[in-house]
Design a protein with these regions (language model features):
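Short, glycine-rich nucleotide/cofactor-binding loops
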Residues: 4-11
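Active-site-proximal alpha-helical scaffold in enzymes
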Residues: 14
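Conserved N-terminal subdomain of the carbohydrate kinase-like
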Residues: 1-2, 18-98, 102-105
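Conserved phosphate-binding/catalytic loop of the ribokinase/pfkB sugar-kinase fold
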Residues: 47-52, 104-124
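Acidic active-site catalytic centers that drive phospho-/nucleotidyl reactions
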Residues: 7, 17, 99, 133-136
């Protein structure tokens, strides 16, 4: 089950997750956390989906289907991060993979400091695997840390 915002170009976000999961012969279950306005040049806007709707989407599927893993991408809001953390409490045996999307590939900031703090406190401790790129890793740990070994220990 993947939690992420949409990307109408399918180059990232929920659509890319669905394509990737399907290419691995798995059934992609997708929870919309936000709707982006973007093209191949950059992100022009992002609207978070209401956390209650994220909760309802997720719990409806979890009541019907078994899943093998959770994957978090761009979550859209602190409220969405909180509700996803609450859902994960009910499924501690299911591994959580986090791709901490902090900015678009072109550098458009997508996560504020409050959202980053919520991810670090509420989701990272529950994670099985975290997949930041080097820029995300530096931002998550500390701006001045250039040692990748130290970054991996800190994360």
């Amino acid at each position: 089950m993947t939690f992420s915002a949409t990307d109408a170009t399918s180059g990232a976000g929920l659509q890319a997750d669905v394509l990737t999961i399907a290419s691995l012969n798995c059934n992609p279950l997708s929870i919309v956390t936000g709707v982006s306005v973007q093209d191949t040049i950059g992100v022009r806007g992002l609207t978070a989906i209401n956390a209650e709707l994220v909760n309802d989407q997720t719990r409806t599927i979890l009541g019907d289907m078994e899943i093998s893993a959770f994957k978090c991408g761009l979550l859209g809001s602190v409220e969405n991060i909180r509700i996803i953390a609450e859902i994960l409490e009910d499924y501690p045996e299911i591994p959580l993979i986090i791709d901490p999307v902090l900015a678009s590939g072109r550098g458009d900031e997508l996560v504020n400091e409050e959202m980053m703090k919520a991810m670090l406190e509420l989701l990272f401790p529950k994670s099985y695997l975290i997949t930041p790129n080097s820029h995300e890793a530096r931002r998550l740990v500390s701006e001045g840390n250039e040692n990748f070994e130290d970054l991996s220990i800190d994360l």
